[in-house]
Amino acid sequence: MAHFAEINDSNIVTRVVVIGNSDCLDGDGNESEAVGVAFCRSLYGNSTNWVQTSYNNRIRKNYAGIGHTWDSGRNAFIPPQPYPSWSLNETTCQWRPPTPGPTDGMYYWDEDNTRWVQV
């Protein structure tokens, strides 16, 4: 199965669909993102924008989810920033806290005090 993310004009993922692998094959039988995009447009309209994503492989850093941002410069889907103090890891395109989370129990992030608090 192949997964494609619909991207709106603000580069936000609005939905993710699953199509058959055969719907992504070019005339030579090779997988082609362009063929998959054309198939999605045939289903949802020619004015829609699609980018392939993968649940099993991180071809675009992260699997696309509704609300994620598509960044073509990074060739990545970026999840929403969970807190203003968290920064983007450029390698993984995941958000990281200002201080690493403790590993000795259950904690939650306290944004007002920018620290981890034990549950």
Where are the regions that the model predicts?
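Interaction-interface detector
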Residues: 1-119
